[in-house]
Amino acid sequence: MPHDNIPFPVTFAAGAVAGISEVLTLYPLDVVKTRMQLSVGKSDYNGTFDCLKKIVKNEGPHRLYRGILPPILMEAPKRALKFASNDTYSKLWRKVFKRKDSSPALSILTGSCAGFTETFVVVPFELMKIRLQDVKNASKYNGTVDCFTKIVKQERILALYNGFEATMWRHVVWNAGYFGVIQKIRNSLTPASSRIGEIRNNLIAGTIGGIFGTFLSTPFDVIKSRIQTVPRIAGQVPKYNWAYPALVTVAREEGFTALYKGFVPKVLRLGPGGGILLVVFNSVIEFYKRCLVHNASA
């Protein structure tokens, strides 16, 4: 999906617009996903819609948007880096391997590199979002700024990067699955003969890519949420620390299926969300191209 003649700032801006569009549309499902992932042992919720209903009934509809500021602040640079760095890495690796076009293997490689890159931006915002979404922490923080201030004051500035390794694996795996599948799906679809057809193909490819990436990355997301919700205390070794040992701990104590807690709301968000991302990103790129043509003919 590289756009060889599109400047980096344009792909960066297109990714930012795509990210904000996706989070504003589907954020409540992220709240539900986090609540389900943080329930240890027997869940407090009997599925996605039961969780939604209980949050609205017991805490009010506004709780479905609690903690949305960090994702909004995060989504612009995160999605911008996702698409812009994916394009940049695609050009780099095609040059290294002397290929004109990308292949599924190269798409997986470039997606993984893009996922690693965006992790550096994501972690502090993810940590604050998780703390604000967790019902057990709800009374500790009075909004995003208060959450940031208390974490830095009580746990020190580096605490904002708790869970970096687990977050890195989540993003590397999700991006590898997402970008690796998109090209394959689009090549198998009937070529679009109109703008509507192009949007349809992007929506289908992006949605399938989002579902596949979510299936691969959910265990790391569960671990990341567990790591980030608990403040670090000096002298105490946390129960969940590194990703792979934590995966084994959760699977042993709660069963393998516990690694897929919150999968339904997550896939309901990131499946269509992957489609929205691809459609909006390519729409912004196409708008830029039309502007270039218009300016050239003026």
UniProtKB/Swiss-Prot annotation:
Physiological role: Transports C5-C7 oxodicarboxylates across the inner membranes of mitochondria.
Transmembrane listed as a keyword: yes
Family named by the database record: Belongs to the mitochondrial carrier (TC 2.A.29) family.
InterPro entries for the chain: Mit_carrier (IPR002067), Mito_2-oxodicarb_carrier (IPR051752), Mitochondrial_sb/sol_carrier (IPR018108), Mt_carrier_dom_sf (IPR023395)
Molecular functions (GO terms): alpha-ketoglutarate transmembrane transporter activity; L-aspartate transmembrane transporter activity; L-glutamate transmembrane transporter activity
A biological process from GO: L-glutamate transmembrane transport
Gene3D superfamilies: Mitochondrial carrier domain
Ranges of the Solcar repeats in the UniProt entry: 6-92, 102-188, 197-287
Key words of the record: Membrane, Mitochondrion, Mitochondrion inner membrane, Repeat, Transmembrane, Transmembrane helix, Transport
Cellular component GO terms held in the UniProt record: mitochondrial inner membrane
Source organism of this protein record: Schizosaccharomyces pombe (strain 972 / ATCC 24843) (Fission yeast)
Subcellular location per the Swiss-Prot or TrEMBL entry: Mitochondrion inner membrane
Protein name, as recorded: Probable mitochondrial 2-oxodicarboxylate carrier
UniProt-listed Pfam families: Mito_carr
Transmembrane segments: 6-26, 62-81, 105-125, 159-179, 203-223, 267-287
Topology in membrane: Multi-pass membrane protein
Taxonomy, superkingdom: Eukaryota
